[in-house]
Regions:
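Short alpha-helical elements
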Residues: 1-284
Length: 284
């Protein structure tokens, strides 16, 4: 919650903040635990969500947030130590349980999306997707059947689907051993399915279009992953890729999906913003 003007639409409500605050590492309180943190965590998190949602540059958030170098330092720290991924994965389990599912999925879907990049993106990390006529980067995602993210991998757009899919499929195999089958479109057919079966011991099934199909139709079993791509691209920072590092692009996507999940988990509850939140959470 912003301290000025009642907050911004991208700010977390207190109910949403209560879901994520236990998942952050304990705040440093000094003197032996490191330098005491000057800015409340919720101001840092709200500033990150503001950047993700509005697409503003790191150096240009409103002045009522923490200074931008501080916000960016936390963004990088939480990326490097795995905090963002842990928060994302914990919330995904809660969303699945709220939907009456087991926290761990048994099936998945994979797809890719090519997006344009800003001029500041290094040439070595972008390329040209000849099929989609896009110069930029390609996002590979694996989701569960609800469309919740299991793995994300960002590469140059010139990488073929059959090559770029191997790493997210491997991550899914390692992090979610219960996933036995993954559905994909025809762009992933061929030797990738053979590799998945031989190396990962999993079934990659291609969902083919009906030969009588005319125009756009939602494909059975694949609509969820296609919808998932709309979640990050609704955030202006992700409408194109601005990040110097592909790994930071992956983290930006996770932040966007975290925002989607906390809103889903608090849907129907009255949103309240009663005042300052504590800097330090109590750790048993």
């Amino acid at each position: 919650m912003s301290g000025v003007g009642g907050g911004y639409p991208s700010d977390l409500t207190d109910e949403q903040w209560a879901l994520v605050v236990p998942l952050f590492p304990p705040a440093r309180v000094g003197p032996k635990g490191g330098r005491r943190e000057k800015h409340p965590r919720w101001r840092i998190v709200d500033a990150i969500f503001y950047v993700v949602r509005t697409g503003c540059a790191w150096r240009q958030p409103p002045k009522d947030f923490a200074p931008w170098p501080t916000v960016y330092w936390y963004f990088t720290w939480w990326h490097d130590d795995g905090t963002v991924e842990r928060i994302h994965d914990a919330l995904r389990g809660k969303v699945r349980e709220a939907d009456g599912r087991d926290p761990e999925p048994s099936a998945g879907l994979i797809d890719s999306q090519s997006v344009r990049t800003a001029d500041t993106v290094p040439a070595a990390t972008r390329g040209f997707d000849a099929g989609k006529k896009v110069k930029g980067r390609k996002r590979f995602i694996v989701t569960d059947t609800l469309g919740l993210l299991l793995a994300v991998h960002v590469v140059a757009a010139s990488i073929q689907d059959r090559d770029g899919a191997k790493r997210p499929l491997l991550w899914t195999r390692l992090d979610h051993p219960g996933v036995k089958k993954v559905w994909a479109d025809q762009g992933f057919a061929g030797r990738l399915a053979e590799w998945t079966a031989k190396i990962l011991g999993r079934d990659l099934e291609t969902v083919r279009k009906d030969p009588d199909q005319r125009g756009f139709q939602v494909q059975h079993k694949r609509w969820a992953v296609e919808r998932t791509f709309s979640w990050p691209t609704a955030h202006r920072r992700l409408a194109r890729d601005y990040e110097t590092s592909p790994a930071h692009s992956e983290t930006m996507i996770r932040w966007a999906v975290i925002g989607v999940m906390v809103r889903r988990l608090t849907r129907g509850r009255a949103a309240t913003r009663p005042g300052p939140r504590p800097l330090v959470r109590h750790v048993p």
